[in-house]
C-alpha cells in the first residue's frame, strides 16, 4: 500500500483537501517579486546589464524557464524570462520570485521564498531557510522565517481568507515541504495574518511507511478546511495541535498482527508574542 493511500485511508482530514502544486513556474504563470529590490537583467546572468529594477510585491508574468541555473546562498534555481510593467521583458533568478504565486488580501500581497540552504553533513538532509513576507505598495510590512530540514519539493496551498474561523485573524497561509514517498518526513508550516502582523506556528512533521506505521501532525481550527471536514469543538480563539498515530506489527510466529492506534489533541498557548506548541503530547498510557 502506498504512503499517499495510507494517509488517505487513516487520516483523510489531513490530505483529502490538499491542493498543492510543485513550485515550478510555467509559461504565463503570474507571481510576485520576493526580493526587496530586484535587478531585471538583459540576459540570464548576474553580470548582464540591468534593464529595470522591481520591488517586493511587483507582479510579473513568466515567459519561460531558461537552461541557466545559478546557486546563491546554497540554493540552486533556474533563471526565468519575465514580462512586467508596460510589457517590458527581462530575466530574473528563480529565487527572487515568490513561491506563493498570487496570494492577496485586499491591498496586501503575500510572498515566500527560500533564502538559504545549508547541508551540515553529506549524509544529512539540507536545512532550508524559508521566509514569508506581507507587502503593501512595495513596502514589506512584516516577515517571518523558519528552517525546514527536508530535501523534498516545496509546495503551497492557496491563501485561506478567514483563517478557518480563528478569532482575531484574517488569513492563513500553509507552506509544505517533503517527498510523496514512504519513510520520508512531510513538513507543514502554518502562518497566520491578523491584519498587521504575521504569526508563525511551530512546524508540523508527518511520516508514514506503507501499512507499517503512520504519524500525522496537524493543527485544528474553529472551522475545517472544507465543508466536509469540521473544526474543533473548542472556543473561537483556540488552536489545537493534533497527533494521530497508527502502527501494525506482525507476530513472531506469523499467526497474526498487533495493531496500535491513538489520537491526541492539545491546545496551543499564546504567550503574548507567539503561539507555543503543547509539550504533553507523548504516547498515551494503557
Q: Where is each model-derived feature located?
A:
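Bacterial Sec-dependent N-terminal signal peptides
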Residues: 1-24
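SH3-family beta-barrel domains
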Residues: 21-45, 51-59, 63-66, 73-75, ...
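Boundary regions of SH3-family modules and the immediately adjacent low-complexity/disordered segments
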Residues: 22-25, 74-118, 186-205
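Hydrophobic beta-strand positions in blades of beta-propellers and related beta-sheet-rich domains
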Residues: 40, 127-134, 188-191, 247, ...
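Short, solvent-exposed loop/turn segments at conserved positions within beta-propeller repeat blades
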Residues: 73-75, 121-128, 182-186, 258-262
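Terminal domain-start segments
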Residues: 97-158, 257, 281-282
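Short aromatic loop motif centered on NTY/YTY
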Residues: 160-161, 167-168, 174-180, 185-188, ...
Amino acid at each position: 500500500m502506498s504512503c499517499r493511500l495510507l494517509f488517505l485511508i487513516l487520516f483523510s482530514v489531513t490530505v483529502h483537501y490538499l491542493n498543492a502544486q510543485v513550485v515550478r513556474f510555467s509559461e504565463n504563470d503570474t507571481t510576485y517579486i520576493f526580493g526587496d529590490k530586484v535587478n531585471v537583467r538583459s540576459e540570464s546572468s548576474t553580470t548582464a546589464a540591468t534593464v529595470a529594477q522591481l520591488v517586493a510585491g511587483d507582479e510579473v508574468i513568466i515567459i519561460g524557464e531558461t537552461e541557466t541555473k545559478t546557486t546563491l546562498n546554497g540554493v540552486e534555481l533556474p533563471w526565468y524570462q519575465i514580462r512586467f510593467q508596460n510589457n517590458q521583458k527581462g530575466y530574473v533568478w528563480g529565487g527572487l520570485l515568490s513561491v506563493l504565486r498570487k496570494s492577496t488580501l485586499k491591498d496586501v500581497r503575500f510572498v515566500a521564498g527560500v533564502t538559504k540552504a545549508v547541508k551540515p553533513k553529506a549524509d544529512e538532509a539540507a536545512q532550508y531557510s524559508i521566509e514569508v513576507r506581507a507587502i503593501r505598495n512595495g513596502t514589506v510590512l512584516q516577515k517571518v522565517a523558519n528552517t525546514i530540514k527536508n530535501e523534498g519539493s516545496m509546495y503551497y496551498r492557496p491563501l485561506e481568507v478567514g483563517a478557518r474561523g480563528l478569532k482575531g485573524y484574517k488569513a492563513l497561509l500553509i507552506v509544505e515541504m517533503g517527498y510523496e514517498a514512504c519513510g520520508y518526513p512531510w513538513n507543514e508550516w502554518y502562518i497566520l495574518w491578523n491584519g498587521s502582523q504575521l504569526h508563525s506556528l511551530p512546524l508540523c512533521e508527518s511520516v508514514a511507511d506503507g501499512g507499517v506505521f503512520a504519524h500525522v501532525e496537524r493543527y485544528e481550527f474553529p472551522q475545517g478546511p472544507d465543508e466536509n471536514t469540521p473544526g474543533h469543538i473548542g472556543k473561537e480563539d483556540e488552536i489545537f495541535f493534533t497527533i494521530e498515530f497508527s502502527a501494525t506489527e506482525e507476530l513472531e510466529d506469523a499467526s497474526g498482527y498487533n495493531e496500535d492506534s491513538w489520537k491526541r489533541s492539545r491546545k496551543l498557548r499564546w504567550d503574548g508574542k507567539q503561539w507555543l506548541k503543547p509539550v504533553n503530547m507523548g504516547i498515551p498510557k494503557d
